Amino acid sequence: MKVFRQQLEQLGAQNQYRSIPDLIHQGRYITRENRKMLNMSSNDYLGLASDENLRRSFLQQYGGNFPSFTSSSSRLLTGNFPIYTDLEELVAQRFQRESALLFNSGYHANLGILPALTTTKSLILADKFVHASMIDGIRLSRCAFFRYRHNDYEHLKNLLEKNVGKFDRTFIVTESVFSMDGDVADLKQLVQLKKQFPNTYLYVDEAHAIGVYGQNGLGIAERDNLIAEIDLLVGTFGKALASVGAYAVCNQVLKECLINQMRPLIFSTALPPFNVAWTYFIFERLPQFSKERSHLEQLSAFLRREVAHRTQIMPSETCIVPYILGGNEATLAKAEYLQGQGYYCLPIGPPTVPKNTSRIRLSLTADMTTDEVRQFAACL
């Protein structure tokens, strides 16, 4: 045990020690250590997670005849239920794509997709800032990979020119909205690059965009009219959609490859049908939340301006607003101060973000009021 204690002590000395907090949730508020605070760190972007009207409508829809609370098995054994197929068909229809496939979480999706679709003769080119789940999927793929500089498409093009001919297939991997900086990938440029090289596929994670962007809330790819051009479009239900699980939209061939070769899908007990039914209920109503999306964008634009005045650094274009302070100690102190003022703000430091870019990751939700965000900004 000594070596493990030393590791923990080292993390503590570097202000990188993590622990699971004891929290009480009350709608938009969180109580921690007897302090009730407005939650400024949630991924519940549309503010649906505590919407009692939605919950009531969902429960009334089923009366007392609820879907099963467990699948008890993998979908490939006895764990498949009609509601899974119903949701996959709805997702594919909304995206106007041939197929969709469900996963237990965004982490499961990103962990399993690339290993299932690559060989030791394949190449992966990933944005430097992609999520840890994508990095883990890349590592499990056992194929060659390079990480291009963040949103630097000249660097990506150079890597493509030097390497594509040496491999049987190439995957370009990116997020659309990046989870720590809140900036947005140029999907149009990525599609154009993909088309210039043979056997090259584009894989985009819309975890922080689904529900929030696009006329129907389908993400940045919808906003930019590029859904049909992206080979694998992945998103989660656990953020703006207030549920659990994830999806990929793709063609039928890729879907069947994933069903046959994706280990996290094959060997995991499927999500409870009850949860999938809730996801269906929310996803079906996604186009109706345009008012929430518009209000969220107004709040976000205001807070981005306020933070930029204080830091002179503002990469964000979205409702994820990084308040970059640099060092760990300053960031921890600022987070503690803001919590004392009644705002649940969390510090983010290395290795989650690059060294000397520790920040408070602020994320806004559509159920916040303009006055609440103004009062918060005054505390910065």
Curated annotation (Swiss-Prot):
Annotated pyridoxal 5'-phosphate binding sites: 106-107, 179, 205-208, 236-239
Reactions catalysed: 6-carboxyhexanoyl-[ACP] + L-alanine + H(+) = (8S)-8-amino-7-oxononanoate + holo-[ACP] + CO2
Keywords: Biotin biosynthesis, Pyridoxal phosphate, Transferase
Gene Ontology terms: biological process: biotin biosynthetic process
Residues that hold substrate according to the record: 18, 131, 352
Pfam families (UniProt xref): Aminotran_1_2 (PF00155)
Cleaved signal peptide residues: none
Record text on subunit structure and interactions: Homodimer.
Family: Belongs to the class-II pyridoxal-phosphate-dependent aminotransferase family. BioF subfamily.
Stated name of the protein: Putative 8-amino-7-oxononanoate synthase
Organism: Neisseria gonorrhoeae (strain ATCC 700825 / FA 1090)
Taxonomic path: Bacteria, Pseudomonadati, Pseudomonadota, Betaproteobacteria, Neisseriales
Name of the coding gene: bioF
